[in-house]
Curated annotation (Swiss-Prot):
The lineage of its organism: Eukaryota, Sar, Stramenopiles, Ochrophyta, PX clade. Produces ATP from ADP in the presence of a proton gradient across the membrane. The catalytic sites are hosted primarily by the beta subunits. It is a peripheral membrane protein. GO terms for biological process: proton motive force-driven mitochondrial ATP synthesis. It comes from Pylaiella littoralis (Seaweed). This is ATP synthase subunit beta, chloroplastic. One of its GO terms (molecular function) is ATP hydrolysis activity. One of its GO terms (cellular component) is mitochondrion. The keyword Endoplasmic reticulum does not apply. Its EC number is 7.1.2.2. F-type ATPases have 2 components, CF(1) - the catalytic core - and CF(0) - the membrane proton channel. CF(1) has five subunits: alpha(3), beta(3), gamma(1), delta(1), epsilon(1). CF(0) has four main subunits: a(1), b(1), b'(1) and c(9-12). The gene is atpB.
Length: 481
């Protein structure tokens, strides 16, 4: 008994492995000093230490843990050390411009120094008394988003779009704009996506200046990756690692933070794998019975407090395009807005290719955004919807067969469609056009002028890839000359 106490005082609590099934490890510890749920266990292997997280206490002094890296080469009898704390990751300014894994270890072949500050990845959501309850618009400077599907400060946005329609460029522009307009930073969590995509994103961020190679502390983003080739434990926890880094910027640095999760479906998928490995009975469509709890634990920590905010943009993969699948259906319950990217618009060369009719937001209410913004947004949608209805007639009979009123609608809709495009700062290197940040007031003013018929005599090309309406008017003059 005395020996146990001494070991506990020294902080030593060793056990040994009794079973290894893939990424799941069972270990036996001395009676009375079992590791707590979510404690990190360290197992020595030939490849270096393997960190596991305690998930279940099985009785008979046995615990079941899930490994955060490959368990190749482990065998029964190997010593397991209880670290007596959950996984903790580095936080603060030193994380900017760096790439981390789920354990907060740098994986970008730069220096291992990432500052002294660390926080555990398992934390409580902010207390209700600390929350900012008044809904506020989070201005992005992107016309189509701010007008038709505005983001809530501290809200959660679902980003839907296939390959090659501009998700990455939109994400990088948002990272750039929050840094310039809000003095905020971003954290990108790559959850269970392709390693190639993670590498491409990193290279593009360096190219566009979002990551400053010469002075990393001037970078605007920290990257956390747990890619497809990682064990399910890492993919399930990497979202929490990214969120913990974001929480520090919000709570300690009192900044506005953008948290990107790509892809939230992979978080659910990893949880499903872990659940099966832990022997839980599957629920609907084979998902884990704890799906709602796991999703809630992550999403409830993403919020606005009186100190700062975390606004989260989550890429959502919809399996087999089935919106009733439990994974996307559970995600939708937490979202404040959806941004849908359209392949049709991308094919027309209209970037950002945000679908103005499919994208939605709970913020688009007169009481929140004001009457003028609401009416303008509704009129823009009505005009575009009418144009969509007329497209079949135009394709068969031609535009000349339309009534004068409908021709005017088509003319204005085409101008609106082009005016919804915008040159991005991060795309300057590809397009040669300088990026534009358009504030909400100028966005509303521009669309009101088009809808009111003040610009009916201007050519539609003048509205393509411009910032505010004054730029479109100036561009039209160059055509006339």
């Amino acid at each position: 008994m005395t020996k146990k106490k001494t070991e506990k005082e020294k902080g030593i609590n060793n056990g040994y492995i009794t079973q290894v099934i893939g990424p799941v490890i069972d270990a036996v510890f001395s009676s009375g000093i079992l590791p707590k749920i979510y404690n990190a266990l360290e197992v020595q292997s030939k490849e270096g230490p393997i960190i596991c997280e305690v998930q279940q206490l099985l009785g008979d002094n046995r615990v079941r843990a899930i490994a955060m890296s490959a368990t190749d080469g482990l065998q029964r009898g190997v010593t397991v050390i209880d670290t007596q704390a959950p996984i903790a990751v580095p936080v603060g300014k030193a994380t900017l411009g760096r790439i981390f894994n789920v354990l907060g270890q740098p994986v970008d072949n730069l220096s291992d120094s990432v500052g002294e500050d660390t926080l555990p990845i398992h934390r409580s959501a902010p207390a209700f008394t600390d929350l900012e309850t008044k809904p506020a618009i989070f201005e992005t400077g992107i016309k189509v988003v701010d007008l038709l599907a505005p983001y809530r400060r501290g809200g959660k946005i679902g980003l839907f779009g296939g390959a090659g329609v501009g998700k990455t460029v939109l994400i990088m522009e948002l990272i750039n704009n929050i840094a310039k307009a809000h003095g905020g930073v971003s954290v990108f969590g790559g959850v269970g996506e392709r390693t190639r995509e993670g590498n491409d994103l990193y290279m593009e961020m360096k190219e566009s200046g979002v990551i400053n190679e010469t002075n990393l502390l001037e970078s605007k983003v920290a990257l956390v990756y747990g890619q497809m080739n990682e064990p399910p434990g890492a993919r399930m926890r990497v979202g929490l690692t990214a969120l913990t880094m974001a929480e520090y910027f919000r709570d300690i640095n009192k900044q506005d933070v953008l948290l990107f999760i790509d892809n939230i479906f992979r978080f659910v998928q990893a949880g499903s794998e872990v659940s099966a490995l832990l022997g839980r009975m599957p629920s609907a469509v084979g998902y884990q019975p704890t799906l709602g709890t796991e999703m809630g634990a992550l999403q409830e920590r993403i919020t606005s407090t009186t100190q700062g905010s975390i606004t989260s943009i989550q890429a959502v993969y919809v399996p087999a395009d089935d919106l009733t699948d439990p994974a996307p259906a559970t995600t939708f319950a937490h979202l404040d807005a959806t941004t849908v990217l359209s392949r049709g618009l991308a094919a027309k060369g209209i970037y950002p290719a945000v679908d103005p009719l499919d994208s939605t937001s709970t913020m688009l209410q007169p009481l929140i955004v004001g009457d003028e913004h609401y009416k303008t947004a509704q009129l823009v949608k009505e005009t575009l919807q009418r144009y969509k209805e007329l497209q079949d007639i135009i394709a068969i009979l031609g535009i000349d067969e339309l009534s004068e009123e409908d021709r005017l609608v088509v003319d204005r809709a085409r101008k609106i469609e082009r005016f919804l495009s915008q040159p991005f700062f991060v795309a300057e290197v590809f397009t040669g056009s300088p990026g534009k940040y358009v504030d909400l007031e100028n966005t509303i003013k521009g669309f009101n002028m088009i809808l009111g018929g003040e610009l009916d005599d201007l050519p539609e090309q003048a509205f393509y890839l411009v910032g505010d309406i004054n730029e479109a008017i100036s561009k039209a003059k160059t055509f006339k000359n």
